C-alpha cells in the first residue's frame, strides 16, 4: 500500500506535468493535488505564510516560495447580460507585467472551477521567468491560493480588486481568513452570490500586503453584489431594480470609505457610459473590447511596466471564460470549467 506521502508526491508530479506554456503571457495547469482547503478553513489563516506552510504539507514540498509585492493593483470589473440572455462578468487585472496562469481545480469536497492566477505571487514579477525550470516550476503548486478571479461549475464567479487604504484586520472571534483563501473558499463552496456573502460574513477578514480589498461577485441567476470592508466592518452593495449592472474599480462605493485619491473613477465612468448606452446588454467580444479600453498601460515610477495582465469575460451560464493575456487582444482563448486542460483559441 502506498504511503500518504508517496500518493501526495505522485499527485504533485502529475499536476506539474500539466503545466503548459501557451505563449509569453499565458500558462495553463490542471491541479491534481489536494490543497486541503477544509482543514485550512478550520484552523484559519492570518497571513500568506499560514497558507503556504499548510500547502507545503499537503503537496509534500518546501519549494513553494511566495513573494507578493505591494506595488499597487488597478483593476476593473462589471456584470452584464449578453444578447443570448447569458449573464456575464468582465474583469481586468492590472499589475506589474508578468504571465498569468489559468488553473483548473476539482476538490473532493467542493465545486470544480477554473481560475486565473497572478504569477507574481510565486515568480517575483519577472515577465518571462522560466517556470519550466524545476525550482521555479514547483512554485506553481501555490496556484489554488493565488487566484485573483475565477468561475465554478455552478456559474458563480468572483474577482478581487485593491483599495489604497489600511488593511482590514477583523477581530470578532470568528476564524480568521486571508484574501486569497477567501476567493478559493468562495469558488469551492458557493453556488450563488448569496452563499458567498454568507461565507465571507462567517470569517474574520485579514487583508494581505497591508492594503484593503473589495470583491465583486456574480452568478448564473443574474445576481451580482459587491463586498467591502470599512473600519473593519463588512458591507454589501446589491443590485436594485433600476441598476442591474454593478461596476467596480479601485475606490469605495460604501459611504464612509476612504477615497482620498479617487483612483479608478475614470474607468468606472467609461464602463458605466458604455453599459448604459447598451441598456446593460453587451456581447462577450464587445465586453472584451470595453476591457481593452480601460486597461492600464504605463511605466511605474520604479521602472517596471503596469499593464492588464489579463482581461477576462466570464459567462456564468456557460461556465466559461474568454481571456486575453498580456494586452494582446489579437489572441483570444476560451476555457471551460468542465474541460480541464483544453485550450480553445478563437
What kind of region is each of these model predictions?
Residues 96, 193-194, 203-211, 278, ...:
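Short secondary-structure junctions and interdomain/linker hinges
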Amino acid at each position: 500500500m502506498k504511503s500518504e506521502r508517496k500518493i501526495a508526491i505522485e499527485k504533485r508530479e502529475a499536476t506539474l506535468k500539466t503545466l503548459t506554456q501557451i505563449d509569453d503571457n499565458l500558462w495553463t495547469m490542471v491541479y491534481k493535488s489536494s490543497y486541503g482547503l477544509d482543514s485550512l478553513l478550520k484552523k484559519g489563516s492570518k497571513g500568506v505564510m499560514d497558507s503556504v506552510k499548510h500547502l507545503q504539507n499537503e503537496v509534500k514540498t518546501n519549494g513553494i516560495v511566495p513573494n507578493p509585492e505591494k506595488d499597487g493593483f488597478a483593476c476593473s470589473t462589471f456584470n452584464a447580460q449578453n444578447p443570448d440572455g447569458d449573464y456575464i462578468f468582465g474583469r481586468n487585472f492590472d499589475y506589474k507585467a508578468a504571465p498569468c496562469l489559468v488553473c483548473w481545480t476539482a476538490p473532493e469536497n467542493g465545486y470544480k472551477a477554473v481560475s486565473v492566477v497572478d504569477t507574481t505571487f510565486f515568480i517575483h514579477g519577472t515577465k518571462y521567468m522560466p517556470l519550466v525550470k524545476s525550482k521555479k516550476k514547483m512554485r506553481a503548486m501555490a496556484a489554488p491560493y493565488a487566484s485573483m478571479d475565477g468561475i465554478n461549475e455552478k456559474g458563480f464567479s468572483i474577482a478581487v480588486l485593491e483599495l489604497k487604504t489600511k488593511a482590514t484586520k477583523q477581530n470578532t472571534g470568528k476564524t480568521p481568513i486571508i484574501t486569497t483563501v477567501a476567493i478559493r473558499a468562495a469558488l469551492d463552496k458557493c453556488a450563488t452570490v448569496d452563499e458567498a456573502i454568507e461565507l465571507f460574513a462567517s470569517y474574520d477578514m485579514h487583508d494581505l500586503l497591508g492594503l484593503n480589498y473589495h470583491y465583486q461577485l456574480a452568478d448564473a441567476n443574474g445576481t451580482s453584489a459587491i463586498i467591502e470592508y470599512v473600519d473593519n466592518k463588512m458591507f454589501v452593495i446589491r443590485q436594485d431594480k433600476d441598476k442591474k449592472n454593478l461596476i467596480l474599480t479601485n475606490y469605495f462605493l460604501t459611504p464612509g470609505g476612504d477615497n482620498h485619491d479617487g483612483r479608478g473613477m475614470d474607468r468606472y465612468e467609461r464602463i458605466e457610459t458604455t453599459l448604459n448606452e447598451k441598456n446593460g446588454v453587451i456581447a462577450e467580444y464587445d465586453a472584451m473590447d470595453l476591457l481593452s479600453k480601460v486597461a492600464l498601460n504605463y511605466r511605474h515610477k520604479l521602472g517596471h511596466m503596469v499593464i492588464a495582465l489579463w482581461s477576462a469575460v466570464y459567462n456564468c451560464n456557460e461556465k466559461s471564460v474568454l481571456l486575453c493575456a498580456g494586452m494582446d487582444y489579437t489572441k483570444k482563448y476560451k476555457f471551460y470549467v468542465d474541460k480541464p486542460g483544453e485550450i480553445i483559441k478563437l
